[in-house]
Regions:
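Feature responds to low-complexity, polar/acidic, surface-exposed segments characteristic
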Residues: 2-46, 54, 59-107, 114-171, ...
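Short, T/G/N/S-enriched strand-turn elements that build extracellular solenoid repeat scaffolds
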Residues: 213-294
Length: 294
């Protein structure tokens, strides 16, 4: 298992004073799910897809089609992860011969490889246009969230009839996603080898992230669930985050200040490089993160 970049697991009250890390703005798309004629507001996915569109994560296949039940490609998922975390640093991906520079997704694949969420299907193939399987999707999300795979090593998957269909390389990630209650499976089981739909992926992200901060300013209201900050010049002051606090890769050139903030879940920093984290009460090591996006 690779070294984790989680700065602190705060399981009790941790009052952080003046945390300064870098940040940069992330783009969003001002659209509504109801703009798409194939969006069903009564469907099981309605809330999750609406949130994904509202937060600029999920784009339409055209100006009128969102294709919620369509299979998500590996390139599309890379793009959504990058948008979510505000990634901006790319790496050379010339070894992947099937990722042409002329393709819309070339930069997104390069960003995803740099972030560490994506590996090729072989040393020379990324298969960007291929549908992404459910176990691949769980792996990518688990990597992005830096889940502690060892902590979930004993997660019981026996309730899923198709447990044995999970590939050995994906098993730690699947256990972590199920153990963290981020994925619940389909009616017939986890179906790890099936392709994930666009709506299903939106639902997974909706299960994980309760809100996004994309506008500069000061926030002093308690935050329900987990929050992902993906812009700069944000101050959280005198508030409690009920879930995880995630500072995305976009934390690069500006600053984020946490003044008397209580985090009941995990504190994960992708951006901000190796800047120190100063806390009045600290429940885990809060040294430099060494994140590739910082």
């Amino acid at each position: 298992m690779k070294k984790k970049r989680i700065l602190a697991m705060i399981l009790a009250v941790a009052s952080c004073l003046s945390l300064a890390v870098s940040a940069s703005a992330a783009n969003t798309v001002a659209r509504k799910a109801t703009d798409f004629r194939d969006f069903d507001k009564s469907a099981w996915y309605a809330e999750a897809v609406s949130a994904a569109v509202d937060n600029g994560l999920l784009y339409g296949k055209s100006s009128t089609i969102i294709d919620p039940n369509g299979a998500m490609t590996r390139a599309e998922m890379a793009a959504i992860i990058n948008r979510s975390f505000g990634c901006y640093k790319a790496v050379d991906i010339s070894q992947y011969k099937d990722v042409a520079k002329s393709k819309w997704y070339y930069k997104d694949v390069a960003l995803a490889v740099q972030m560490g969420t994506y590996n090729g299907r072989s040393n020379s193939s990324m298969a960007p246009d291929s549908p992404i399987t459910r176990q691949e999707a769980m792996t990518v999300v688990a990597r992005a969230l830096e889940l502690d795979y060892d902590a979930y090593a004993k997660t019981d998957l026996s309730k899923f009839a198709d447990e044995k269909n999970i590939s050995s390389w994906a098993l730690p990630y699947v256990r972590a996603m199920v153990g963290a209650d981020y994925i619940h499976g389909r009616t017939k089981g986890l179906e790890p080898l099936d392709n994930i739909t666009r709506a299903e992926f939106a639902q997974i992200f909706h299960n994980i992230i309760g809100s996004y901060i994309t506008v500069k300013g000061t926030y002093d209201k308690d935050i329900k669930g987990s929050v992902l900050i993906r812009t700069d010049d944000v101050e959280l002051k005198n508030l409690t985050v009920d879930g995880d606090l995630i500072i995305g890769c976009g934390a690069a050139d500006g600053k984020i200040v946490l003044d008397n903030v209580t985090v009941k879940g995990r504190f994960l920093v992708w951006g901000g490089g190796t800047k120190a984290v100063y806390c009045k009460q600290r429940h885990a090591n809060a040294g430099g993160c060494g994140c590739p996006c910082g």
